[in-house]
Amino acid sequence: MKKNLYKISENKLIASKTFKMVLEGDGIVEGEFVDIGIPGYFLRRPLSVCDWEEGRMTLVYKVVGEGTKVLSEMAVGVELEVLTGLGRGFDPEACRERALLVGGGLGVPPLLLLAKRLKAQGKQVTAVLGFNKADEIILAEEFRAVCDEVLISTVDGSVGVKGFVTDAIAAARPSFDYFYTCGPMVMMKVVCNTLEGPGEASLEERMGCGAGFCYGCSIQTKNGPRRVCKDGPVFKKEELIW
C-alpha cells in the first residue's frame, strides 16, 4: 500500500452515469483496487482498477452519490490523494488453457486487465459481459480487442442475448477450465452455483479504511471470517458461503 498524489489526465463520460478516469504519477503500486480521497469527504472511495501500467492507471466508476458526483466534475490536471496497491487480485495462473470471464455492470472493468494478462500467457479467453440496457454498456470494444470471444447480454434485450449473463453462457456454451467473475452479488452467486469447475469471484462490500484495520468489510467464509479489502476482494469459489 502506498499513499501519494496523482494527477487526473482523463475524466470522461463513457456510458450512462459512468466515467473513465486516468491517473498519472510516480510511485503507483499495482493492486486490485485503490482508495481515492475526495476533498470535503472523510471516507475514501474504493474503486477497482481497470488497467494499469508504470506510472498510469485507469479507473471506471459510476456516479451513485455526492462523492462520486464531485469526482465526475473534477478537471484534467487536478491532483488526488490515492492509496494504491490494495487488495488480493485474480490468479491468472489458476487457468490452464481456457478462461471464462463473467462480468456484470461495474464488475466488468477489473476483468479487462485480467483478460490482458491471460492472453499474454497464451490462454484462450471468452468474456461474457452483462448490462441492464444498451446505454450502460462499457468497454465492449476494449474486450473485443483482447479476447477470443466476447458475448453481451442485456436485461431488456437491446443488445446481444436478452436476459442475464447466465442466459448468454447457456446459449453459447463456451469451453473453459477456469472461470473468473465480478459484478452484483446476486449475479456472482448464480454464476458460482451454476458453472461447474473451479473459479474465483471478486466481492464488493462497503469499506471503511480499505486497508484491513476496521473490519467493516468482514465476511464469513468456509475458512472463517475474512476482510474483503485485505484478504480479498477475490476469493476462490469453494471458500464462499452464499
Where are these regions (language model features)?
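Ferredoxin-reductase
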Residues: K2-V78
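Structural signal for conserved beta-strand scaffold positions within catalytic alpha/beta enzyme cores
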Residues: E10, D51, I152-T154, A201-L203, ...
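FNR/FR-type flavoprotein reductase catalytic core
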Residues: E66-L203
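Short, Lys/Arg- and Gly-enriched loop/turn segments at beta-strand edges
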Residues: F42-V49, G87-A94, C229
